Structure formats: C-alpha cells, structure tokens
Amino acid sequence: MPKGTIVKALSGFYYVQNEDGLFQCRGRGNFRNRNIKPLVGDEVVFEAENKTDGYVLEIMERKNELLRPPIANVDRAILVFSAAEPTFSPLLLDRFLVHVEANGIEPLIVISKIDLLTEEELETIKQYRNDYEQLGYKVYLTSTIEQLGLDAIRKEFDDHVSVIAGQSGVGKSSLLNAINPALDIETNQISSHLGRGKHTTRHVELIPFGSGLVADTPGFSSLDFIDMEPEELSHYFPEMRDRLPSCKFRGCTHTQEPKCAVKEALAQGEIREFRYEHYVTFLEEVKTQHKRRF
C-alpha cells in the first residue's frame, strides 16, 4: 500500500501527498468509531484507484500533535508576534512557548512590524529579544514593509515541517508572502474597530516552502493548559528547568517553598521577573484546570 503525508484537510476530504502526486481521500469509517481523526501532517497508509477517489487506511504513530491548530508531526513552530498593532505581548508569547515546548516542538520567535516603532520602543523590543536569546531561543526582528530580517528567516524553513502561528493580526500571512511571493496567501487589514486582525486563514494546509513544508494556520489568541499537571509547568521554562534538581523539595512549585533554587535565582537577577510572573499566572490556571478534571 502507498504511503504519504496529509497536506490539507477540508470538507471531509484528506489530501495526501507523495512522490506520485496529490490524492484526494476520505477517512475510513472505523476512524470515527475509534475516535481517531486524521490530521494535517499525519503520515498515512492509503489506497487510491485514481487521484480523486482514495481512502486513508492507517495513521502512522505521531511524534507530536497540536490541538489548536490541529496538526501533527511538527518540527518547528514559528511564533509571530507584532511589535505594534497589536501591541507586543510577552505574556501571550510565553503562553505559546509553554504550549510548543510541552509538545516537543522547537520554537522560533519572530517579532514583526518593527517599522512602526519609535527608537525608544525599538530599544524595548531589542531588550526582549536579548532576554529570550539568553534562554536559548532564536529571535528575529522583521518588517515586511522594509524587507528587514526576511532572508535569515527563509533559511529556517528548509528541511523542516513548520507551523507558523501567533496572535491574530500580527502579519503571519504577510510574512509568508514576503518571504515567498509565489504563495499569495490571503491577507486582511487589521480591524480598526476591534484593534484585532480578522482570521484570514480558514483551514490548515501544508505548503511546500523551499526544501520544507509550512502550515499557515488560523490565528488564535488564547491557549488552555489542558491535561497539564502543576508540577510539569516549570519544565517548560528553560531557566527553571535547569535549576529543578537544586530545589530542596521534590514537586516544588517555586512559590512558597523554602530553599527553592528558582526563587534564589530570581532574587539574584538570574531569572527575569516578567518571566517568573508569567509562570505564576500560568500555574494558577493549571491548578484550576487540574481541579476541574478531578
């Protein structure tokens, strides 16, 4: 049986790509019975007598899976956040970072629209860039209007399956179009009434991009910490993860406990205060979600 990758899911059809071309397939009924849904990015076994009448028979084991956007087997998450319109939100960025770290995906941070900033505002954004780079993240400052930073990002897509995600209205589609004008992905102007972008991308699709594949996904602005245990959260903050073995108490939440290596590092300025505050905010959310489950 042939194998391939689902590159698009739309209206009950799954479009499977392999070396022989693109095949339009439906899922077998037993997927529904087993509560399994094929996802874009899935490696699958399928059968097809022609290019428009195939069936997905088996889904290979996934290395990871995102719920929003619904996609599997992602290598990298390109997280696009605007410096302005909408205003840069490190709180939302950290929420995304936790989400992708928890799924074993390598994040890259892109801060767009830097052409809209004053010199003082740009210095603030550069400080954030330094903060995140010190944690080991790659950070790019870009402007599609002034064509800044695009060449460096273009290389990051090669030989990877990447998802491009971020807050609605930050210019994800514009960024992809600027890097590869042949894509011509639909874009909308930001809604002046709401101060938020319209959701121009209505389905998930993997698009050939250099020697890799990229998914331009529906914009979204919130992520829930579903199924996460409270003691897990600190593992997704790199500056905390390395210090966990030095905490006195196993299962330390790094809030009230004595002899906490994380709080000691915070007091010494080795952990940025805004990152710790975000951790505490997320921890309360995780605890609330946990109580709802049990």
Curated annotation (Swiss-Prot):
Family matches, as InterPro entries: G_CP_dom (IPR030378), NA-bd_OB-fold (IPR012340), P-loop_NTPase (IPR027417), Ribosome_biogen_GTPase_RsgA (IPR004881), RsgA_GTPase_dom (IPR010914), RsgA_N (IPR031944)
Any Gene Ontology CC annotation: cytoplasm
EC primary class: hydrolase
UniProt-listed Gene3D superfamilies: Nucleic acid-binding proteins, P-loop containing nucleotide triphosphate hydrolases, Probable gtpase engc, domain 3
Transmembrane segments: none
Cofactor binding annotation: Binds 1 zinc ion per subunit.
GO-annotated biological processes: ribosomal small subunit biogenesis
Location within or outside the cell: Cytoplasm
Enzyme Commission code: 3.6.1.-
HAMAP family listed in its UniProt record: GTPase_RsgA
The protein's assembly and partners: Monomer. Associates with 30S ribosomal subunit, binds 16S rRNA.
Family in the record: Belongs to the TRAFAC class YlqF/YawG GTPase family. RsgA subfamily.
Function, as annotated: One of several proteins that assist in the late maturation steps of the functional core of the 30S ribosomal subunit. Helps release RbfA from mature subunits. May play a role in the assembly of ribosomal proteins into the subunit. Circularly permuted GTPase that catalyzes slow GTP hydrolysis, GTPase activity is stimulated by the 30S ribosomal subunit.
Name by which UniProt lists this protein: Small ribosomal subunit biogenesis GTPase RsgA
Native organism: Halalkalibacterium halodurans (strain ATCC BAA-125 / DSM 18197 / FERM 7344 / JCM 9153 / C-125)
